[in-house]
Amino acid sequence: HHEIVQPVMDMIERSDGVVFSVSCFQGHLTGVMKNFTDHMAFMLHRPRYFHKKALIVCTTGGISASSTTKALAATLPGWGFNKCYQLPVTALSWNAYEPAGKDLRKAEKAARRFYLDVKSGRMHPPSIGVLIPFNLFQALCVGNAGEKEYPTEDNHFWPRYLGMQYAPG
């Protein structure tokens, strides 16, 4: 597990921003992307990408591009991502799609906003729905630093970051 996931985590860490290109399957993330988010689920307990921004792109030949981008955009702040931009595009043809002017303008607007935000280094305030679990995990685990009977990686992680803020700066 670690050998597969760590290189991806390292790439995210070295990046200024991350573009996720996701497919839609039955109105949601595909099994492959769901497997990836499952492998990264420990990040909800030990987030770290506080200065990272994400652009989530989904095209679908029908419906549900929005629900697909929203699903990933709901997960990434728990990993620490500071801001998630979404670009859902619905194609009118599965085989011969040519982007409409509206879709091109939408893509340019999303890309420009993402780029300017990454370039600015601006930190956006986190939502209360992100702050509550962040502070809860920190408070619960710091007191368990010396836990011998049921040691967890969380109990080793959080004492090193005692007092860490979700969105420093």
Regions found by a protein language model. Give the residues of each.
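Glycine-rich phosphate/pyrophosphate-binding loop and the adjoining helix
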Residues: 82-169
